[in-house]
Amino acid sequence: GLLDYDIFIANPDGSELRNLTNSPGSYDAEATISPDGESIVFTSTRDGDLDIYVMDADGGNVRRLTDEPGYDGGAFFSPDGTKIVYRAYHPTDPDELAEFRALLADGLVKPSRVEIFIMDADGSNKKQLTNNGAANFAPFFHPDGKRIIFSSNMHDPRGRSFNLYMIDVDGSNLQRLTHHDGFDSFPMFSPDGKKLVFGSDRNASDE
């Protein structure tokens, strides 16, 4: 469950390991670093909900960026560091919200409808990019800063197959990139945009 996680930083060889969050009983996780290396964006339960926060690279100056009830997470900075893309589950039905909060109290989450959002790096100008009621997650910026790649099951009525999609930062021009009856997700571009790495079960055996 989401009981007690902290964020650490270390050199590539594992030396100089440091704990940046040290908040007992909180879920501090899903951390990514800004392009200039000065800021870290992460998800935390420290204020009672799953929200996105940003802090300096040394762990100081923590600021909360989201405050809507639900699960805001999976955040990444844009290549120029001015925007943050993330995925969110915001239950609006009172019963659904009550179930979310009851599960969260036990360190559990069960979001099935997740949408892609974008905001300025200071938490302002939040904009919802997808609105299809499916599970859209693992968003990542294209190096041009104008498009978002993400994973979704929007085209599978059963909700089982996840494929990669691209969408402009204004929510237009949705494109499907992979056609796989399985799981394609966690896409990331190389800095020059020429390579795309992602996780997939397409080479898994049936055993």
Could you describe each region identified by the protein language model?
Residues 11-15, 56-60, 120-124, 168-172:
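Short loop/turn segments that connect beta-strands within beta-propeller blades
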